[in-house]
């Protein structure tokens, strides 16, 4: 590319940013008042596991007046393709040599076979991360199915816990 064309491209890119046509990425955190004194804060992401399966990943905190908050991670796989093993805890590989376990909330009964939900209250107290996490998903038919959680998603989750 010659210098004149390079300058034109650079000016166009600057103009696009200046006019606000491209906005910076923002956190996808939602807050909903479910009832008076009851707030739900959540982050929703669609992520792919190492096998190429798409997952709906919902991290949420429910806060009720005069009650301790509950913090959960819900994982939803494609119906008919994925089935969680219940009761089975979720292994969270924070870094080499550090694996935390999140208790299965649906140990008694899951709303659907492709849905898993895990208690993150104890995980929040031990939270350490400056990198991605890998979740070992307790599903049927797979030797080891892993879902990588990018660092920007973990930062959203930390923001939900802090508020």
Residue ranges and their predicted role:
Residues 29-65:
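Transition segment at domain starts
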Residues 81, 96-142:
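Short, solvent-exposed, Trp/other aromatic-anchored flexible loops in extracytoplasmic proteins
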Residues 1-4:
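N-terminal secretory signal peptides that target proteins for export/translocation
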Residues 23-27:
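Sec/Tat signal peptide C-region and signal peptidase I cleavage site
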């Amino acid at each position: 590319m010659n210098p004149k064309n390079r300058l034109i491209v650079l000016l166009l890119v600057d103009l696009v940013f200046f006019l606000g046509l491209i906005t910076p990425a923002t956190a996808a955190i939602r807050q909903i008042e479910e009832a008076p004194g009851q707030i739900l804060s959540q982050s929703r992401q669609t992520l792919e596991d190492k096998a190429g399966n798409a997952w709906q990943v919902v991290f949420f905190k429910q806060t009720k007046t005069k009650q301790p908050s509950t913090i959960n991670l819900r994982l939803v796989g494609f119906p008919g393709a994925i089935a969680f093993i219940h009761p089975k805890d979720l292994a969270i590989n924070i870094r080499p040599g550090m694996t935390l376990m999140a208790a299965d909330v649906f140990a008694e009964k899951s709303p659907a076979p492709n849905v898993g939900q895990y208690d993150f209250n104890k995980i929040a107290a031990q939270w350490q991360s400056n990198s991605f996490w890998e979740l070992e998903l307790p599903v049927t038919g797979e030797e080891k199915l892993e879902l990588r959680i990018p660092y920007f998603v973990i930062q959203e989750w930390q923001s939900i816990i802090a508020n």
